[in-house]
């Protein structure tokens, strides 16, 4: 028996050695494959990051797109019933103009390769292979910037409610989105001269909101006030027809701002967008409190419309610096933006400037304040960039360097956009016409411009008074007997 054990033992040892050899060989293969597997894993992670970044930018753009619903409700609530349908038509046309013109020329001027003043490549989104990969792709970046442009245009239209020809809106929108707005955007977001000087505007307090307010101001100066707004040298209240609609619009805008500011990181991975969103909400809360105090001081009452506008003013104010300031500073910036809105409303009335929705103080003055505030409240840890000349704010030991850069960036925007939009409004006035007739304004733009009522129940049709040929004409308003509802 003993003689038979050796072969068995040998066979066992041989089997063990064979298994060991296979193990070593397998380990060698695995070791040789580790770099490839690691590379594959890294590639997969990169693809995942790109997908997440793209998704974040697109979802943010969808939120910004939905802000148009907020503008619709806000402006409808502050307009009279006879103009509610005209507001709806204006908003949907605003979107059409913004997408088409930003696709045709706006994106190229704002973000195409060019010089320090404007871009000159990428007409009709033909970028010749250039990929804006920071946000997950060119298409996502284009969509996000197009809805920003639409917001700026919406600001313009709100101030000119109740008295402006629809054709004038269209002509202005084509030139504004196609040429004016994107050039200023290029100065900072397109890597232009302001960006190289260290000017900061994270999500558009000046680029989006101040530009829109400037165009609104020049437009209303050329247009003039609504009928009966100023009588005997004093401003007369022309209240809107629905504060709940207005406030619903404010809340939708507030929600949309999470995409407006949050997705301006242009990436979800490696970017602290939650910090941006927290600052945005804290500022809005501060704005409501500030506007409430301002309303008590100016009007001796808690004006609900001022409270809503205070929230919007604060959101505008924090938009430039939401990524650059600490939370406490966001509250202060929002509070001051809300606080100064009611006095500016009173000042505009004294100057006989008719701003039905308060866009000039809310988007203009708050936009200026928020852009300047970076030069005061931005800590060094968030802003210092020696290559771009960016420094800390005044209250963080940075001196006045950043404040000065912010100031002349604002001044350049005011000069460029103010002059060009004033010229454009004057050209429109002298050509297609800017203002509807007094009869049309009294009848309401719903019927005089669009041939229908936003609220049909507002008017009681007199039986037999409407021939079929005139049922949808501007003359219909004179044949309608107003109901007891307010117009």
Regions of interest found by a model, annotated:
Residues 37-487:
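Glycine- and aromatic-enriched membrane alpha-helices
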Residues 4-41:
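N-terminal secretory/membrane targeting signals
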């Amino acid at each position: 028996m003993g003689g038979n054990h050796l072969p068995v033992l040998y066979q066992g040892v041989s089997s063990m050695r064979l298994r060991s050899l296979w193990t070593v060989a397998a380990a060698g293969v695995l070791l040789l494959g580790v770099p490839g597997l690691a590379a594959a894993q890294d590639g997969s992670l990169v693809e995942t990051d790109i997908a997440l970044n793209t998704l974040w930018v697109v979802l943010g753009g969808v939120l910004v797109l939905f802000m148009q619903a907020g503008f619709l409700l806000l402006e409808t609530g502050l307009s009279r019933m006879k103009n509610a349908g005209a507001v709806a038509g204006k908003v949907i046309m605003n979107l059409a103009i913004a997408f088409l013109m930003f696709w045709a020329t706006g994106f190229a001027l704002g973000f195409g390769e060019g010089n320090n003043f404007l871009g000159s490549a990428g007409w009709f989104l033909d970028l010749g292979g250039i990929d804006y990969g920071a946000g997950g792709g060119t298409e996502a970046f284009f969509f996000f910037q197009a809805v920003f442009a639409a917001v700026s245009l919406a600001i313009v239209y709100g101030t000119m409610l109740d008295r402006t020809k629809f054709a004038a809106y269209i002509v202005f929108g084509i030139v504004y989105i196609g040429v004016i707005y994107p050039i200023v955007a290029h100065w900072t977001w397109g890597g232009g001269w302001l960006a190289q000087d260290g000017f900061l505007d994270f999500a558009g307090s000046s680029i989006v909101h101040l530009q829109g307010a400037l165009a609104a101001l020049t437009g209303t100066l050329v247009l003039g006030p609504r009928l009966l707004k100023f009588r005997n040298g004093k401003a007369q209240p022309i209240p809107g027809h629905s504060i709940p609609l207005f406030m619903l619009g404010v809340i939708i805008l507030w929600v949309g701002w999470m995409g407006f500011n949050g997705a301006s990181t242009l990436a979800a991975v490696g970017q602290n967008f939650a910090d941006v969103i927290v600052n945005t909400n804290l500022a809005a809360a501060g704005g409501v409190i500030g506007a409430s105090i301002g309303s008590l001081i100016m009007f001796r009452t808690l004006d609900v419309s001022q409270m809503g506008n205070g929230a919007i003013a604060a959101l505008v104010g924090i938009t430039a610096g939401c990524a650059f300031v600490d939370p406490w500073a966001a509250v202060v910036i929002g509070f001051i933006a809300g606080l100064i809105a009611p006095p500016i409303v009173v000042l505009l009335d004294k100057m006989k400037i008719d701003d039905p929705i308060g866009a000039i103080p809310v988007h203009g003055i708050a936009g200026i304040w928020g852009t300047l505030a970076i030069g005061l409240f931005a800590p060094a840890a968030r802003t210092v960039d020696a290559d771009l000349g960016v420094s800390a704010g005044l209250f963080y030991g940075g001196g006045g360097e950043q404040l000065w850069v912010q100031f002349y960036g604002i001044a350049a925007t005011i000069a460029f956009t103010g002059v060009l939009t004033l010229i454009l409004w004057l050209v429109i006035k002298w050509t297609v016409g800017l203002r509807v007739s007094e009869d049309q304004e009294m009848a309401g733009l719903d019927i005089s411009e669009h041939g229908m009522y936003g609220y049909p129940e507002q008017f009681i049709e007199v039986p037999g008074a409407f021939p079929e040929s005139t049922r949808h004409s501007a003359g219909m308003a004179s044949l309608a007997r107003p109901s007891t509802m307010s117009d």
